[in-house]
Amino acid sequence: MTLTGINQLWVADIPYVRLKGEFVYLAVILDSFSRKVVGWAVDRTMMSHRLTVAALERAVADRQPQAGLVHHSDRGLQYASPEYVAALDKYGMVASMSRPANPYDNASWESFMKTLKQEEIYTNRYNDLEQLRTNIEEFIEEYYNRQRLHSALGYRSPEEFEQQSERKQPANSRGATVQFTVNDENEKQASTWITGEGDSNAVPFPRPQPF
């Protein structure tokens, strides 16, 4: 699939995060063109459609995509639920799910998860859901999308990359190819990537210190 701009391919997944005494779930939607996080939500359960729909609604409110956007996910029940499928239909999105013989290339998602682990999750101990929500919002909205440089984007942040792409190049003049490859292990491990006791290589992002 060749991407020529934003809001053509969104990739969604649900990792889980360890809190003090419990696990909670983080639904994230990533724009594959710019690697920008366009929607996210956290909740104590992923057994209903509430978590995933909340992330989707947030993404739609922020991006206002046109019909025809491809929404890719694994085959989890949360993304296959009637409520979530109805939400995709409501916004004219094309649902795409990984199959045993043809999972999607997870390069942009893996890159985001690695950054989230090393620069946020593994450098903090969260006491409760509200603390996690506050930290995740600050990490995504203030740092990752606006400041974090990506080698794949020419050492630009997702927002800078989007702005320069829109300003300097027509939407149909820039092509970026997303290669679909077989990698069953990525799908199997999708909900375990950001758990753990910590990592010796973890480096926190430069969160502003309170006065």
Identify the residue ranges that each predicted region occupies.
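Charged DNA-binding/catalytic regions of mobile-element recombinases
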Residues: 1-211
